[in-house]
């Protein structure tokens, strides 16, 4: 199950999910069978991302959202505001920050790239960064079946 949450706020760099959308997400995640792969995506960061500059741009309600995704055993959180590729695992949740495939404006020195997430039938996961600038696939994380369930 994939939930795309709108995090931008008009005329602000910071984002937030807000109580109404948080309640919606809580309800939807709570109704899913445990065996489902659960993915939540939004634009802003849930946690600060290294090498992202002075602006961390985490969600205003990041603590509440982090608690929700950990409590509801969300498998993957996808985000990417600052264009820096990063993968971080907290408990059984993998936070995946995307870089950029086209912009060189803010993080151009890091090259252009995107993430590829391979989910295997045995429950294992491999996450790659495909660096378009170098035409190279880089394994960023690998989790055996015991760590993905």
Say what each PLM segment does.
Residues 52-122:
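Conserved beta-sheet core of the metallophosphoesterase superfamily
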Residues 1-36, 55-63:
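Binuclear metal-dependent hydrolase catalytic cores centered on His/Asp/Glu-rich metal-binding motifs
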Residues 9-11, 44-48, 83-85:
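Short, catalytically relevant binding-site loops at active-site mouths
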Residues 33-37, 74, 122-124:
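A general structural motif
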Residues 120-149:
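A short C-terminal boundary segment appended to hydrolase-like catalytic domains
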Residues 34-51:
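Short acidic, glycine-rich surface-loop motifs adjacent to enzyme active sites
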Residues 1-9, 39-43, 94-100, 128-129:
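Active-site-proximal beta-strand elements of phosphoester/diester hydrolases
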Residues 10-12, 103, 124:
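Short, acidic Gly/Pro/Ser/Thr-rich loop/turn segments
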